[in-house]
């Protein structure tokens, strides 16, 4: 994957971050219409700020994104903006969620962030394949499906 340097009026930059954040209480609510709405909302909010979503994937209980954030913004301010504004927009579109979450806070506090250097292709591949990895992991670790009366 070619390394793309971005430009501002007096700056050349390449600031990419792998970010993971979750709904409040890590509830598995990101599916169907809510999933497509969250994707659309995050794309729109990033476009407003000039942030590029290089890769992104919405899991039922968390969101993975690879973002190119201009150096004029801190990661903390971008995440506050994305999580705050998207919460309001999600509750506007899905008013029934207020009973599950209350206080118009859809996202949990905090997030995971790591910088992406020259291993951008590896991180993008990880984000793309995260869902299939989680499904395989769940199949291996689901104890409820085992017969409790079977001798070992």
Specify the residue positions occupied by each region the protein language model found:
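Basic nucleic-acid-binding interfaces
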Residues: 1-152
């Amino acid at each position: 994957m070619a390394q793309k340097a971005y430009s501002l009026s007096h700056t050349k930059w390449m600031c990419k971050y792998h970010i993971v954040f979750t709904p409040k209480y890590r509830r598995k609510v990101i599916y169907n219409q809510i999933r497509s709405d969250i994707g659309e909302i995050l794309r729109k909010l990033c476009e407003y700020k000039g942030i590029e979503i290089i890769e992104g994937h919405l899991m039922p209980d968390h969101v993975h994104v690879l973002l190119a954030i201009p150096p004029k913004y801190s990661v903390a301010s971008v995440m506050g903006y994305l999580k705050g504004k998207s919460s309001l927009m999600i509750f506007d579109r899905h008013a029934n969620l207020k009973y599950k979450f209350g206080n118009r806070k859809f996202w949990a506090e905090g997030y995971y962030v790591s910088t992406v250097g020259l291993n951008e292709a590896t991180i993008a591949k990880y984000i793309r394949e995260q869902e299939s990895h989680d499904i395989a992991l769940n199949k291996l670790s689901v104890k409820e499906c085992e017969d409790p009366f079977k001798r070992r």
